[in-house]
């Protein structure tokens, strides 16, 4: 059976039309419903409330503040984060526990918000449409029938929930993230700082962060580019950004006290 999202996407392709914002929002809503039903989403009201408020504080500063944004914490120790079209952003517990300071978490949120603002997943669909790529390839591009499930990717290990972005997509999301977290008053240096932290983690705990590196191509040149964007950022001149806060560490402690994550599902497992 074709997943409803795949059917909807294929209709858009066959119709030869670009994806409108309303269609994007509907695709995201349907995909999020599938993901939320199968991933271990954290329902603790304090955790859920904090991540929603934090994410919204950044999303409200973007050019797509009109979207109905939703932010979630996934109960898995894998270090990763991802976004779905239409304003759905997910951060794994493992990334929150790895972050040393607030600005590293806000940097992550800003980056993922950047993918939505730039409509990267939607552009992949439109590219598939324009080049007349078949439904099977469209499925792999949009990741809505990953691992042969014929439905939204729901890999608890955190290695593949969504289409892997190109290096250009990642650079655009970095730029968008730097601008928008700074507009929200958070230190944009948290973005390259997190990248450096993850590179260090890969040396000592490679399996913990492998999902991040699979989904987010990362090299030293990208870190240097983020540093340069921050140096040239007008908003950074003379501003005192928020680097850390007691509220973040209370949130992090609350996350650490959550029940243990469920058994990890191996990559590619149904």
Region locations from a protein language model:
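Post-signal peptide N-terminal segment of mature Sec-exported envelope proteins
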Residues: 23-61
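C-terminal capping/extension segments of zinc metalloprotease domains
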Residues: 1, 17-30, 61-80, 165-270
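Acidic/histidine metal-binding catalytic segments
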Residues: 47, 67, 126-131, 149-153, ...
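Juxtacatalytic substrate-recognition/specificity segment
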Residues: 36-40, 63-97
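Short pre-active-site segment immediately N-terminal to the catalytic Zn-binding motif
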Residues: 90-107, 122-125, 163
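Membrane-active amphipathic alpha-helices enriched in small hydrophobic residues
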Residues: 129-145, 149-161
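Sec-dependent bacterial lipoprotein signal peptides
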Residues: 1-15
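Catalytic Zn2+-binding segment of zinc metalloproteases
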Residues: 103-104, 113-129, 141-142
């Amino acid at each position: 059976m074709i997943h409803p999202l795949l059917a909807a996407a294929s209709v858009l392709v066959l119709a030869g039309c670009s994806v409108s914002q309303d269609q994007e929002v509907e695709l995201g809503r349907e995909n999020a419903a599938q993901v939320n039903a199968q991933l271990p989403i954290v329902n603790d009201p304090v955790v859920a409330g904090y991540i929603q408020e934090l994410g919204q504080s950044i999303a409200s500063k973007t050019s797509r503040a009109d979207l109905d944004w939703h932010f979630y914490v996934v109960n898995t120790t894998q270090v990763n984060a991802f976004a779905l079209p239409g304003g759905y952003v997910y951060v794994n517990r493992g990334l929150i526990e790895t972050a040393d300071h607030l600005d590293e978490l806000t940097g992550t949120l800003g980056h993922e918000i950047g993918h939505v603002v730039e409509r990267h997943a939607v552009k992949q669909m439109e590219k598939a449409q324009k080049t007349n790529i078949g439904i099977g390839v469209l499925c792999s591009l949009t990741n809505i029938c990953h691992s042969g499930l014929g439905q939204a990717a729901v890999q608890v290990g955190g290695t593949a929930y969504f289409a892997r972005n190109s290096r250009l997509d990642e650079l655009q999301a970095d730029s968008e993230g730097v601008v928008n977290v700074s507009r929200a008053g958070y230190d944009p240096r948290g973005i390259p700082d997190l990248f450096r932290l993850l590179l260090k983690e890969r040396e000592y705990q490679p399996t913990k962060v492998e999902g991040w590196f699979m989904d987010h191509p990362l090299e030293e040149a990208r870190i240097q580019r983020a540093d340069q964007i921050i140096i040239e950022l007008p908003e950074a001149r003379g501003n005192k950004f928020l680097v850390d806060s007691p509220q973040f560490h209370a949130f992090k402690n609350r996350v650490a006290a959550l029940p243990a994550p469920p058994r990890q599902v191996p990559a590619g497992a149904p």
